[in-house]
Design a protein with these regions (language model features):
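Long, charged N-terminal accessory/stalk domains
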Residues: 151-152, 158-203, 207-210
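Conserved NTPase motor "head" modules and their coupling/switch loops across ABC/AAA+ ATPases, GTPases
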Residues: 5, 20-61, 199-360, 369-373, ...
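A short helix-turn-beta junction within AAA+ P-loop NTPase domains corresponding to the substrate/partner-engaging
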Residues: 402-411
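Conserved lysine of the Walker
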Residues: 66
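Walker B catalytic acidic pair
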Residues: 364-366
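Nucleotide-state sensing region of NTPase/ATPase domains
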Residues: 74-159, 163-175, 228-236, 288, ...
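Structural recognition of the conserved hydrophobic beta-strand(s) that form the central parallel beta-sheet
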Residues: 387-393
């Protein structure tokens, strides 16, 4: 599949044109969730919330189902879940199917989006008309913050890549398509390597891998280079330490060859082999194709020896640095939390800048994990124009001023 490079930021006309006509206007104007109902979903037989405002706090003991409701919101708004479950896990034990229905409005008209889950299948409808998941994904992007995210600064590059890819998939449909194509091709290649297939067969698969891999690399790097200044600025605003923050993206063809990133003027962008960047902020795809193809040929014997694919965007490295030191090894717990908080707020900014509308913010039991300063930063950022859902076991970590403007639901 050959795609023109158009995933550059600021081309709102292109983003609108690629979105389904029935949903295009509403994304531009911004959507607000007014009602949500679930049946036979997770632990809920029936549950509904109506007349939802900008801030909803779900309070209850562990295991009561608070997180399940956030997951329901994300499944409908983003066509995905931060838990990455199998469909059978979403259906209440003893039931044959489950349903989530959400009402949204842009201020002029109401939209009903529903998700039916049964027998390993999921079916979306918008105002009663069947839609593919790709048509629903990103119509109301969701930014999710869970306790697991607090380890983002210390965890491996795979977690950081996944976070970028999940954001990118909500910003443009092409990102998700290219990512899915690449992952499918990669799985096939790894099976061939494991089965010790012929060099000619693997070389043929590498041609497809180069096509979709170079596209994914360009999409991800464009998003990374656009997001990093936001992340850097927000981290500086919320950090009390005054240390310089930087991030690097090191392509697989460099780190597999033993090339190390060098911090400098472009430390928040690409590290390693210089890559030409076009005016739209995208890497030169022809150069990326050439680099990836050459690297695959150069490391073909090593991949065959290890029985796994070493080269491609699935093995690119992303690292955070504080004062020039690797944050995964040297950052304090407080610094790690500041990095993750800055990352999540930068995600919100990217949705705003790219789609011209606010996301829905889903905060799963993170208020008690943050100190007062970071809680206030998060709450102040999630101002009245960002619809926010928060879960908590109790309200002790909440500012009284925040509680005054919240709808509190005891589960």
């Amino acid at each position: 599949m050959q795609l023109d490079w158009t995933f550059h930021f600021g081309l709102d006309v292109w983003l609108e044109a690629k979105r389904p006509t029935a949903l295009r206007y509403h994304v531009r104007m911004g959507l607000h969730i007014t009602d949500i109902a679930v049946s036979d979903f997770r632990n809920y037989e029936r549950f509904a919330l109506g007349e939802l405002g900008n801030l909803t706090i779900l309070v209850g003991r562990n295991g009561v189902g608070k997180t399940n409701l956030l997951e329901a919101v994300q499944l409908v708004t983003s066509a995905g879940s931060f838990r990455h479950p199998q469909i059978i896990q979403l259906i209440r034990e003893g039931a044959e199917n489950a349903r989530i229905q959400m009402e949204t409005t842009d201020g002029n008209r109401r939209i009903t989006t529903a998700l039916a889950l049964e027998a390993g299948k999921r079916r979306y409808t918008v105002n009663g008309k069947a839609k593919a998941a790709a048509d629903v994904r990103g119509t109301l992007p969701a930014v999710v913050f869970t306790p697991d995210d607090l380890q983002l600064a210390k965890k491996s590059s795979s977690v950081k890549r996944q976070a970028l890819d999940e954001l990118g998939a909500q910003l443009t449909r092409n990102y998700h398509v290219v990512l899915a194509d690449y992952e499918k091709t990669l799985r096939y290649k790894n099976r061939l390597l494991k089965d010790e297939a012929s060099r000619d067969l693997i070389a043929a698969i590498d041609e497809t891998l180069v096509t979709c891999g170079s596209q994914l690399f360009c999409y991800r790097v464009a998003l990374f280079t656009r997001m990093m200044p936001q992340l850097q600025r927000i981290y500086t605003d919320i950090s009390n330490e005054g240390e310089a923050f930087a991030a690097t993206y090191l392509p697989s063809w460099d780190h597999v060859a033993g090339i190390q990133p060098s911090l400098g003027g472009t430390a928040e962008c690409l590290a390693g082999t210089p890559i030409e960047m076009r005016e739209n902020g995208a890497p030169d795809r022809d150069q990326v194709r050439e680099l990836l193809a050459d690297s695959l040929a150069r490391f073909a014997e090593e991949e065959a020896r290890r029985h796994r694919s070493l080269l491609g965007p699935h093995n690119d490295k992303i690292a955070f640095y504080l004062a020039g030191r690797d944050a995964s090894a040297f950052a304090s717990q407080g610094q790690q939390r500041s990095i993750v908080l800055a990352w999540k707020l930068a995600e919100v900014e990217m949705v705003r800048q790219t789609l011209g509308a606010n996301p829905v913010l889903l905060l799963d039991d993170v208020m008690s994990e943050l100190d007062e300063t970071r809680r206030d930063t998060l709450v102040n950022f999630a101002s009245d124009d960002i619809q926010t859902f928060i879960t908590a076991t109790d309200l002790t970590a909440f500012n009284p001023t925040l509680l005054e403007r919240a709808r509190i639901i005891q589960l």
